[in-house]
Amino acid sequence: MVGVIGTDYPMEKLAPLKAKGVDMSGVEIAEGESFRWRARYRHDLNSAETLETRLGVFSHFRPKIPAAFVDSPFVFLGNIDPRLQLDVLRQVTRPRLVACDTMNFWIESRRPDLLELLGHVDLITINDAEARQLTEESNLVK
């Protein structure tokens, strides 16, 4: 796992991951507030209305992939700025599968970067509303 958390993050929340053997050596702790996203989901959970996005320590984060992770066969790019997701991909060597997540905030604010990223991934995880926003199509069945 590679990422950043702020000094406000409750460290006890990492314990279950560590107990399951997750290598946390790529998680940085930076001075400041952790990323926050607040939303309201509709009844079907296929669309969310973003109420608040606070980037916090993500706004200055530059991922550094530990040497032990560079040749990972599977890479999941979590929901962060697509420019950072691309930076992560430049630091790994030939993964067999690359998946990414994104959200309406990045689709709206970093669309060109996100489209560039999508040329390098095998799988994207988004909900129906994000798919409509990304494709600019209302009919997802097409």
Q: Where in this protein do the model-derived segments appear?
A:
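Structural motif
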Residues: F74-F76, A99, T125
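Short gly/ser/thr-rich secondary-structure transition/capping motifs
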Residues: R54-H60, T102-S109
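A short acidic, amphipathic alpha-helical/loop segment
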Residues: K13, L84-Q91, P112-E116
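Conserved phosphate/ATP/ADP-binding segment of small-molecule kinases
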Residues: T93-L97, N104-K142
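Conserved N-terminal subdomain of the carbohydrate kinase-like
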Residues: M1-F76, R90-P95
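Short beta->alpha connector loops
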Residues: G6-D8, N79-L84, M103-I107
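Glycine/threonine-rich flexible loop motifs
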Residues: T50, L86, L134-E137
